């Protein structure tokens, strides 16, 4: 549903030289890839909606409003990627723990749900975020924000390090263009959740797997996740 090409390009250009230098320094360091160590969170079935227990995880987050691709959205990605790569490099150099920067994720909602069904994108609300390993503390996060600000200027007011605990969730992998997610999302909300005696318990969550600049639209992979809880009975 949502474009992330600008943010990816910005991050690559911003940190290309730094990244190459650091990789030469520690060529034998083990690199953790959460997509491989926690496959259930990032690579669910594309055929069947599943229930999964999602543990608490911390993220670099920024809030915004409006259609993806507007100035606020582009500026958000222009901050999230540099800060996230800055954290990765500091973790590698100072803590001797290397990892693959996790994929971009987004929480999406609207004060009036019909804003989605009628495609009133100016009313869309969102939080874009990138996972930060649990061994990273606020001090390191703040230092990376300060460093990014040298080139980017004042940081967004909502840029923060925050823990998200979704708990039980329904999720499935959507394969195809972002704009074609609608029927799958509807199936989660209108069929799977009520059929299992559940109700929504959080915001619609998307995880964008892979690089949309290098992937044909029909092969794009997006995790569609909805926190749920048991429906109370009288």
Question: Where are the predicted features?
Answer:
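A solvent-exposed interaction/effector surface
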Residues: 25-234
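Short, Lys/Arg-enriched N-terminal segments with co-localized hydrophobic residues
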Residues: 9, 14-28
């Amino acid at each position: 549903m949502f474009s992330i090409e600008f943010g990816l390009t910005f991050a690559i250009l911003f940190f290309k030289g730094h990244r190459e230098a650091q990789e030469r320094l520690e060529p034998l360091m083990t690199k953790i890839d959460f997509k491989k160590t926690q496959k259930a969170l990032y690579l669910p079935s594309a055929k069947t909606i599943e229930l999964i227990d999602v543990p608490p995880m911390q993220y670099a987050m920024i809030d915004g409003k409006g259609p993806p691709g507007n100035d606020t959205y582009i500026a958000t990605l222009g901050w999230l990627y540099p800060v996230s790569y800055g954290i990765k490099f500091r973790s590698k150099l100072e803590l001797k723990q290397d990892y693959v920067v996790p994929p971009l994720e987004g929480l999406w909602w609207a004060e009036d749900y019909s804003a989605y069904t009628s495609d009133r994108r100016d009313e869309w609300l969102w939080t874009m975020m990138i996972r930060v390993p649990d061994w990273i503390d606020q001090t390191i996060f703040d230092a990376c924000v300060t460093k990014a600000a040298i080139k980017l200027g004042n940081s967004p007011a909502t840029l923060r390090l925050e823990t998200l605990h979704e708990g039980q969730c329904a999720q499935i992998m959507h394969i195809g263009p972002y704009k074609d997610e609608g029927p799958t999302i509807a199936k989660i909300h209108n069929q799977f959740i009520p059929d299992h005696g559940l109700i929504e318990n959080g915001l619609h969550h998307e995880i964008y797997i892979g690089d949309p600049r290098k992937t044909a639209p029909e092969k794009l992979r997006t995790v569609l996740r909805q926190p749920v809880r048991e429906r109370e009975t009288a």
